[in-house]
A protein has these predicted regions:
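Loop/turn elements at helix/coil->beta-strand transitions in domains of secreted/extracellular proteins
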Residues: 21-26, 57-62, 115-119, 173-181, ...
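Catalytic-site neighborhoods of secreted/periplasmic enzymes
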Residues: 77-179, 183-206, 375, 380-382
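Active-site-proximal N-terminal segment of extracellular/periplasmic enzymes that hydrolyze or transfer
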Residues: 20-59
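C-terminal cap/loop subdomain of S1 sulfatases and analogous C-terminal strand-loop tails that border
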Residues: 172, 291-297, 339-342, 347-394
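Sec-dependent signal peptide recognition
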Residues: 2-9
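Hydrophobic h-region of N-terminal signal peptides that target proteins for export
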Residues: 9-18
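Active-site-proximal cap/lid insertion segments
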Residues: 32-45, 171-175, 183-335, 348-355
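Short, solvent-exposed turn/loop segments enriched in Gly/Ser/Thr/Pro and often Arg
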Residues: 40-45, 58-82, 121-131, 182-187, ...
């Protein structure tokens, strides 16, 4: 069933009336969410209906690539608007291996909070100080059981994140706000791999299993880069899946779709809360991910060094006042959410962007204007997952 958010339509047709009012921003981020499961990008599994509804009223960037296919480096880069080699947050390890973002580095939160915005963050952090400027509320895990799939703290924390974001957006402040609802799922897929290590015969769902992707098989293993050849030795989840049969990979896809549907319901609740008050009319919504997931392509699960599109090509969606609805995804423009989110939101809010930030503002494209400044290429980096293993190759 298609959901219509009542104030969204009003927002899109009331740009002139809102022109002098600073827009609010709601950023919804889902860990591991790849384009390969989002309906707005042509997928037909029906896993992301609330996200698809937002996308249908705004702008969808197809060629959006993250700066690192790993959570902490990607997030530290995203909220600071710099690449991992610039932040020196290059793995998922904590201090002293990875330094915190220095206090003198402008972040998305500091720029907005210093310019009259209330900046709030709910949910997953994993940021090494890059969320400075945001008021963070730690989510309370709410355990529950699932009859078909294993659930862990990722899913439990998302319940608390959803409740916190809904409570805030149902009673928003009078001043302009920038709010982040930062969900863990579909990250619970990592726990699914651990719970199903090796060949297993149980079926997590009844009925027909999802088909394997067209690029499931690795046809020329000896000629692919060494880091990818040895990924089963350097990545725990790939080791756990290394002896799976084809049906086991179909189980994996079914589980990934399940966790995506779980978080989509929570996204729906957050959006309904936003549009339940007049503030929703003046709020730009951004939907994105810190990185993607292998989705059984090239026999890969979760994320790691490979840089395949499944891991690095993420949803990047904007909708709201001042955003000109486009009938088709923007395919001609290369974007780096890691770098481009900060200058784009600052531009839309009328906030000056520090000159040292390497990203570009996508505001012209969002407004239906000519995009003069573009990326000639995109960059994604890899160092190590936890610095325990040196990955071979470049």
């Amino acid at each position: 069933m298609k959901t219509i958010y009542p104030f969204m339509g009003l927002a899109l047709c009331s740009v002139t009336a809102q022109a002098q009012e600073k827009p609010n921003f709601l950023i919804i981020q889902c860990d591991h969410l790849t384009q390969r499961v989002v309906g707005a990008y042509g997928q037909t599994q029906g896993c992301t209906l609330p996200i698809d509804e937002v996308a249908s009223r705004g702008v969808i960037f197809s060629n959006a690539y993250v700066g690192c296919p790993l959570s902490q480096p990607s997030r530290a880069a995203l909220w600071s608007g710099m690449m991992p080699h610039q932040t020196n947050v290059r793995s998922n390890s904590s201090e002293p291996i990875n330094p915190r973002i220095p206090e003198n580095v402008p972040t998305l939160g500091s720029l907005f909070s210093e310019n009259g915005y209330e900046a709030v963050h709910f949910g997953k952090t994993h940021d090494m100080g890059s969320l400075r400027g945001f008021k963070h509320k730690e989510p309370v895990a709410k355990p529950f059981t699932d009859p078909e799939f294993p659930v862990n703290n990722d899913s439990f924390l998302d319940v608390g994140t959803c409740e916190d974001a809904v409570a805030y957006l149902s009673n928003p402040p009078k001043e302009p706000f920038i709010c982040i609802a930062d969900f863990q799922n579909p990250h619970n897929i990592c726990g699914f791999v651990g719970a199903n290590e090796g060949v297993h015969t149980d079926r997590p769902i009844s009925g027909t299993l999802p088909e394997l992707p067209a690029n499931f098989d690795v046809e020329d293993w000896n000629n692919i880069p060494k880091p990818v050849q040895y990924i089963c030795c350097s990545h725990r989840r790939m080791t756990q899946a290394s002896h799976w049969n084809e049906e086991n990979y179909s189980h994996y896809i079914a589980a990934f779709q399940h966790y995506t549907k779980m978080v989509s319901k929570q996204v729906d609740s957050v959006l309904k809360a936003l549009y339940s008050t007049p503030a929703g009319r003046n709020t730009i919504v951004v939907i994105m991910a810190d990185h993607g997931d292998g989705m059984a392509s090239h026999r890969m699960v979760t994320k790691h060094i490979s840089f395949y599109d499944e891991m690095t090509n993420v949803p990047f969606i904007f909708a709201g006042p001042g955003i000109k609805q486009q009938k088709k995804p923007v395919k001609q423009l290369l974007t780096q959410p890691t770098l481009d989110l900060l200058p784009t939101l600052c531009d839309l809010a009328g906030i000056s962007v520090p000159v040292e930030k390497p990203g570009i503002s996508l505001a012209p494209t969002l407004k239906g204007e000519k995009q003069k400044k573009t990326h000639p290429y995109v960059v994604s980096e890899w160092h190590s997952e936890y610095e325990y293993v040196v990955t071979p190759g470049r």
